[in-house]
A protein has these predicted regions:
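Charged (often Lys/Glu-rich) extended helix/loop segments that serve as interaction or gating elements
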Residues: 1-158
Length: 158
């Protein structure tokens, strides 16, 4: 493959919204932010190149109380118990708390088709159209994980 224009077109078109699950201060290393989404939702293209991150203003945090001078480097991790689940090793971010939302930008290429329902069901997909946001793929449920599985009759309980 010499040229892959699709990735250049699609990457900026999709963003991943993640919730901060935990914030830890690691002595000698700095802040570690753990999100509810990570490598299980991001495509391999996103795994090789760090994506820009930013906090989403949900209105419950006074953004004026967090000037850029309060930002500090943070390592950002996904929810997987794997050393590869690093979203960013050092991104300047404001003070964060569990429940805050982070936006992983430029996450479009192959993200939906190659995400894996590991640890939790897959995320929904929202299209931001001319009339506002529209759900175009609902979030998976626990039942969705098993809906295609078939149980042979000899394994069924009487």
């Amino acid at each position: 493959l010499v040229l892959e224009p699709g990735r250049a077109l699609v990457d900026p078109a999709m963003q991943l919204v993640c919730t901060v699950v935990a914030v830890k201060n690691i002595p000698g290393k700095g802040r570690a932010i753990i999100l509810d989404g990570g490598r299980n939702l991001l495509s391999p293209a996103c795994r090789r190149t760090p994506r820009p991150l930013s906090m989403i203003d949900t209105g419950h945090v006074d953004q004026t109380a967090q000037p850029p001078s309060s930002y500090s480097p943070a390592a950002v991790f996904g929810p997987l118990c794997m050393p590869e689940d690093i979203i960013s090793e050092a991104t300047l971010l404001p003070p964060l708390a569990p429940g805050d939302l982070l936006l992983v930008q430029e996450a479009g290429a192959y993200t939906v088709t190659q995400s894996m329902p590991f640890v939790r069901p897959g995320a929904g997909v929202v299209l931001i159209g001319p009339d506002g946001p529209v759900l175009i793929r609902r979030r998976e449920t626990d039942e969705d994980l098993f809906v295609r599985d078939l149980l042979p009759s000899y394994l069924e309980r009487p």
